[in-house]
Amino acid sequence: MIPRVKICCISSVEEANLAINYGASALGLVGNMPSGPGVIGDELIMKIARIVPPSVSTFMLTSETSANEIIQHHKRTLTSTIQIVDKINESSYVLIKNEQFELYL
């Protein structure tokens, strides 16, 4: 088995391209957080996500805790994956899973 590697805290298109060129399988793009490194704005997250080839996953790390906030955050960034970094209630998982996401690429 060959492990897949996610590089987190990507902060620019240049860093994203560098990680991709070195073989990253996924990129972590950190949204607004109460603390910690690597936070970038939603517009930059979307800009980076749009240049990444389909073979590389993009993770939007969100500290939002309600289903609606998480869904709205994703709609502002359009990454291929949502990474929830805080505790949310079980019903939120169901709402997020059932959301019909549309990608406008």
Tell me the role of every PLM-derived stretch.
Residues 1-91, 95-105:
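Conserved N-terminal beta1-alpha1 strand-loop-helix module at the mouth
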